Amino acid sequence: MVRLNTEEVLTGGVERLRWSVAAEESEIVVALAGELDLATVDPLGRLLGELLQYRPTTVAVDAARLSFLDSSGIQCLVDAAQAATNVGCKLVVQRPTANVVRVLGICGLDQLLLADAESDPTARR
């Protein structure tokens, strides 16, 4: 896996979201750490859009260190998943925390976004 870049989003001088991007063959992995909310969705949305220009087979969002996800963060992921579909790619959320699984499940988006949802819908609950 080749690490491409690392970025952070600051709000009021405080780090809110950090990501690193790595690529392996036709998959791009975006590892998130921190909060995905109204203050951080725009930079992440731009990044995901830029990555889709490379036409990977999969964009995997590694959510293992994502501490918070609100409705704007969910919308960012849904929009990115739709954009990915439009270019023949799949966006999936990998290694989500229990809170991320719960929030996506409540919204009915676990089947759409979670990497293991199709093979085993109870695997992450």
What are these regions (language model features)?
Residues M1-F68, V78-R125:
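STAS-like cytosolic regulatory interaction modules
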